[in-house]
């Protein structure tokens, strides 16, 4: 079974999970290839929800294509659930997210939800976070300041270029990748994140940081994880 089949399988499992929610509510929807499979699987059941709140421009485009109603987060009081993938997830449900560059939108929508339903394949499960480079979204003016502060954590800091992300965004490959918010992203490699909540708080206090791709405060409540044997449901 290949990676796409695993993503499709867990996307369909997430569809079944959210259809257990009472009808007429607003659903939070994440970003990325696994989230896309979830959106596609849910399309035939969009009438179950009063609308959706999207974590990125790309997700909004896909939801609208399928006929979902997409609401402004500022007009929504709260969400019963937020469904999204992860770049890494540890045994406690802490995650690294932001490989696709939309960590700030994802964290905002996740904070609105009563539960975070994480969907991924088993390759994303790790004993300790840090094998995947940790994304940090910053104000461009602060690149030097934030880079020096991040180096104190012991990792290698690099500025993400447009060529290292999605080609469909039509950004100049040799220029810094620009987020939906106009920010840049610093990727911190070589970390071993034994205390995700502590590191999340410390990095978020650095002047110039918009947010860090550690989801410890907004950790997963439910994990749907696919492997060759099927989909396992883990509650944290």
Swiss-Prot record:
Protein name: Ribose-5-phosphate isomerase A
Gene Ontology CC: cytosol
Gene3D superfamilies associated with the record: 3.30.70.260, 3.40.50.1360
Substrates-to-products reaction catalysed: aldehydo-D-ribose 5-phosphate = D-ribulose 5-phosphate
Gene Ontology biological process terms from the UniProt entry: D-ribose metabolic process; pentose-phosphate shunt, non-oxidative branch
Family per record: Belongs to the ribose 5-phosphate isomerase family.
Assembly mode: Homodimer.
A molecular-function term among this protein's GO annotations: ribose-5-phosphate isomerase activity
Keywords tagged on the record: Isomerase
Keyword Transmembrane assigned: no
Amino-acid positions noted as binding substrate in the UniProt annotation, renumbered to this chain: 31-34, 84-87, 97-100, 124
Pfam families: Rib_5-P_isom_A
Name of the top EC class for this enzyme: isomerase
InterPro entries assigned to the protein according to its UniProt record, in alphabetical order: NagB/RpiA_transferase-like (IPR037171), Ribose5P_isomerase_typA_subgr (IPR020672), Ribose5P_isomerase_type_A (IPR004788)
Catalytic-site annotation from UniProt: 106 (proton acceptor)
Species this chain originates from: Polynucleobacter necessarius subsp. necessarius (strain STIR1)
Role, per record: Catalyzes the reversible conversion of ribose-5-phosphate to ribulose 5-phosphate.
The protein's Enzyme Commission number: 5.3.1.6
